[in-house]
Each structure stands twice: as C-alpha cells, then as structure tokens.
Curated annotation (Swiss-Prot):
Reaction(s) catalysed by this chain's protein: (2R,3S)-3-isopropylmalate = (2S)-2-isopropylmalate
Lineage per the UniProt record: Bacteria, Pseudomonadati, Pseudomonadota, Gammaproteobacteria, Enterobacterales
EC number: 4.2.1.33
Family: Belongs to the aconitase/IPM isomerase family. LeuC type 1 subfamily.
Protein's recorded name: 3-isopropylmalate dehydratase large subunit
Coiled coil: none
One Gene Ontology biological process: L-leucine biosynthetic process
Pathway(s) annotated for this protein in UniProt: Amino-acid biosynthesis; L-leucine biosynthesis; L-leucine from 3-methyl-2-oxobutanoate: step 2/4
Length: 466
C-alpha cells in the first residue's frame, strides 16, 4: 500500500498499538528549555524516576534569557528561577545543557539542527509549539505539554493519535527576493489560520525544493500557524549536505548508510492525502500581516482591506476587531503604515541566511529616526558566523542593536517587548494581541522586509530598494 511520508514516519515509530487505543510512539530526540520543563523534572523526582535516555535529551536556555547580558538575574525573578532549575535538573539527571555561557546556547529550534541533533526520519518533541521546525529534515516533530514532557523524560515514548494528511504544493519558481517567509505567509493567507487543523502537512513542489535548509525550517516552523500538528519536507541532497559533518550527525560509513535509508523517506507514488492545496510561486509577492491572526495577510503593495469586503460574517467581525486593535483604517496603502520597532530574530528567522538578507538591505543605510531596531542571532554559532562575516558591523553602523542569542521580542517573556500601541515589523511567527507585549501591534515579515521597514520607517517593497 502506498504511503505518505508522514505515514512512513509514524508507522516506523509505533512501539505498541492495541485495538481501539491510541498508539504509543518511540521518541528519538527530546529538546528541553527552561520554561516548560521544571514541573516535568519535579514529577520525575517525586516518583524516584530517572531520565530514561539522557543521551537523546538536549537542553538549552532561550525563552526568557536577556539578549543584552549573560547575567541570569537580568530578566527578573521568575526567569532566574526557571534557569537555575534547568541547571540543577540537567546536572542531577545527566542531561546535556547549553547554558548562557556555552558557545552552542541559543533558541532550541536553531540549536538542534545546527548541532546535528535533528536528523531525517526521527521523531522529535519539545515543550514548545514551534517544534514543527525540525520537520524541514523529514522528521516528525511536534510540540508537547509539560505533562507529556515528563512522560517522554521517563519513558522515551508518547501516546499519539494519527493525524489527517495534507499536501501543500507550491508550483513553479518564486521570483527573486521572495523568501520562505513570504511563501508560508501566502500559504496561510490561502488556507486561513485554522486550515491545517488536525493535519500533518507535507510541503512540496519546485519552489519548496529550491529552498535551502534554513528556508525549509522557516516554512515548517510556521505550519503550526495554520493549525497543523506538524510540517514536513522530504529529505534530499540539500538535506544530506546540510547534515553532513555536524556534531551529532553520523560519520563515515554510518553516514552513508543513514543517507541510503533517508532516501526512502519520500511519499510513495499513488499515496493519497486527505487535503491538497496548490499555489503558484510566481504569484507570490512580499507578504505582510495586517491583523491579529496569520490568515490576515496581504502583499506589501496592497491596501488595508475593508471588513465589509468579507462575505463571511465571522471573518468580517474578526477583521473589524483586528483593525481596531491594530489602529489601522481600511483602504490605506500598507506602504504608508509607519512603524516604531523592528525585530529580526526568533526560531523562524534568526539563522545566518536571514541575517545576511537583512544586512544586504541595511548596508550603507541608517535606521529611520524614531525607530528602534533589534537584530538577535538565533544561537552562539550564528552570532559568531555573522561576526566573522562582518554583518554585526553593518547592522551597528546602520543603527541596529546587535544582541545576544535568545527568543527575545518574539514573545513577552523577557525584557525585549513592545509598549502599548507600538507597531513592530517582526520576523517572528505570531501576531495575536499582546504576543510581543501588552497592547503591542505586530506585523510579520521576512528579514529583508523588516530591514527595509527599519531604514524607511514604514513598510516598503524590497524590490524597489536599490
């Protein structure tokens, strides 16, 4: 029987499946951070249980770390306690930890791939909704809750029901300057923010194959934003070349044997999907969200939509509410919307290619008066690579702030946040009310688009910036 990639991955990891019961899956990698793990470790301690597979468990600090200092006290008492607990728990249970002073420290979904912890064919979980990022490697990766974190720590397994399958094919080639972020925003603009609910999505088509691994990570990172359980891209030579030589990747003959297996991780000819969505890459332009869910997205050259133009009464009401919160009027050109802050970072867009794209726009220009612009590398290695290439100097000379690695302004859990009423061009992944700070107004864009907003003071089409 022909199988989809998702079905192959799922079936290969079933430990036990009784009739009329939820299957038990084996988990190959468990990624841990400071926010969703303390209670899980407390649960182990209370029952006298060890971590079953510490060698398959990797921890880092990211969510509430300061991006201005490595001082553990910088972001308040709750952050300090969570980080201290992670240090204590990892030491007690034998889990490898990349703490604030470790050269590999960074956002968990940046750290995993760059260290070769993430490999094709694996099941990967983390107490974080954007674990879908790792699906870019042809791995089944999804976020879990704290009680599930404890279960995986204790058993290296997890009960999971089978999801429905969705194929999203982006046909043809994207135009120059169109990034994975634009592609995925255009996809969600078509499906809506709940279009993938109950599904695992496989992204395919020429435009997807053309993406680098970093682009594919951006794509899969945001599968959750259309309601999907996970996102997948089948592994290919791009994947194998990225993985080869990384710290935790197989070496020598083991790598060759692994690649031979990884090449089987493709959807079979004749396999069927529950849902199929198709887009034409050439029709995708630079995207900007205007509302408070990711389905509320338009081309940078469009006008803010009129709620009256929505036939669906629920969509109309949602648009009215979003415009009121965002402080926008229908009909005004998006390029006339001024911004207060710019955030380039997050598990969506903080890798070296993202920083290069932003630096290309920033080079020789200055951040507009009254705009605060932050560049937050996703990890220690990304920061070091950017500095080796001189990107930090480009940003600093242009008036951007060059920060330490962390989740930063993606979410209001540290010192980097919006004040009420402030408008931000952000490369992160969520734009709901208060995500970046109470009363903050978030517009999601690609790194180059964020840099363009920083230097012009408003949204601007990067294709017009010479």
């Amino acid at each position: 029987m022909a199988k989809t990639l998702y079905e192959k991955l799922f079936d290969a990891h079933v430990v036990y499946e009784a009739e009329n019961e939820t299957p038990l899956l084996y988990i190959d990698r468990h990624l841990v951070h400071e926010v969703t793990s303390p209670q899980a470790f407390d649960g182990l301690r209370a029952h006298g249980r060890p971590v079953r597979q510490p060698g398959k468990t990797f921890a880092t600090m990211d969510h509430n770390v300061s991006t201005q200092t490595k001082d553990i006290n910088a972001c308040g008492e709750m952050a300090r306690i969570q980080m201290q607990e992670l240090i204590k728990n990892c030491k007690e249970f034998g889990v490898e930890l990349y703490d604030l002073n470790h050269p590999y420290q960074g956002i968990v979904h940046v750290m995993g791939p760059e260290q070769g912890v993430t490999l094709p064919g694996m099941t990967i979980v983390c107490g974080d909704s954007h674990t879908a990022t790792h699906g870019a490697f042809g791995a089944l990766a999804f976020g879990i809750g704290t009680s599930e974190v404890e279960h995986v720590l204790a058993t290296q397994t997890l009960k999971q029901g089978r999801a429905k399958t969705m194929k999203i094919e982006v046909q043809g080639k994207a135009a120059p300057g169109i990034t994975a972020k634009d592609i995925v925003l255009a996809i969600i603009g078509k499906t809506g923010s709940a279009g993938g609910t109950g599904h695992v999505v496989e992204f395919c088509g020429e435009a997807i194959r053309d993406l680098s691994m970093e682009g594919r990570m951006t794509l899969c990172n945001m599968a959750i934003e259309m309601g999907a359980k996970a996102g997948l891209v089948a592994p290919d030579e791009t994947t194998f070349n990225y993985v080869k030589g990384r710290l935790h990747a197989p070496k020598g003959k083991d790598f060759d044997d692994a690649v031979a297996y990884w090449k089987t991780l493709q959807t079979d000819e004749g396999a069927t999907f529950d849902t199929v969505v198709t887009l034409q890459a050439e029709e995708i332009s630079p995207q900007v969200t205007w509302g408070t869910n990711l389905g509320q997205v338009i081309s940078v050259n469009d006008n803010i939509p009129d709620p009256a133009s929505f036939a669906d009464p629920v969509e109309r009401a949602s648009a009215e509410k979003a415009l009121a919160y965002m402080g926008l009027k229908p009909g005004i050109p998006l390029t006339e919307v001024a911004i207060d802050k710019v955030f380039i970072g997050s598990c969506t867009n903080s890798r070296i290619e993202d920083l290069r794209a932003a630096a290309e726009i920033a080079k020789g220009r200055k951040v507009a008066p009254g705009v605060q612009a932050l560049v937050v590398p996703g990890s220690g290695p990304v920061k070091a690579q950017a500095e080796a290439e001189g990107l930090d100097k480009i940003f600093i000379e242009a008036g951007f702030e060059w920060r330490l690695p962390g989740c930063s302004m993606c979410l209001a859990m540290n010192n980097d946040r919006l004040n009420p009423g402030e408008r931000c061009a952000s490369t992160s992944n969520r734009n709901f009310e208060g995500r970046q700070g109470r009363g903050g107004r978030t517009h999601l864009v690609s790194p180059a688009m964020a840099a363009a907003a920083a230097v012009t003071g408003h949204f601007a089409d990067i294709r017009n910036i010479k």
